[in-house]
Amino acid sequence: QSPGCCWNPACVKNRC
């Protein structure tokens, strides 16, 4: 369970 996708540049919702 991650709070967002800060570590994933390919994530559509790249937010922490």
Curated annotation (Swiss-Prot):
Q: Show the domain comment.
A: The cysteine framework is I (CC-C-C). Alpha4/4 pattern.
For this entry, the protein name equals Alpha-conotoxin PIB
**Cysteines joined through disulfide linkages:** C5-C11, C6-C16
Modified sites of kind Cysteine amide? C16
| Its job | Alpha-conotoxins act on postsynaptic membranes, they bind to the nicotinic acetylcholine receptors (nAChR) and thus inhibit them. This toxin causes paralysis upon intramuscular injection into goldfish and blocks both fetal (alpha-1/beta-1/delta-gamma subunits) and adult (alpha-1/beta-1/delta-epsilon subunits) subtypes of vertebrate muscle nAChRs in a dose-dependent manner.
Chain positions with 4-hydroxyproline modification: P3
Which keywords does the record carry? Acetylcholine receptor inhibiting toxin, Amidation, Disulfide bond, Hydroxylation, Ion channel impairing toxin, Neurotoxin, Postsynaptic neurotoxin, Pyrrolidone carboxylic acid, Secreted, Toxin
Cite a single GO MF annotation.
Answer: toxin activity
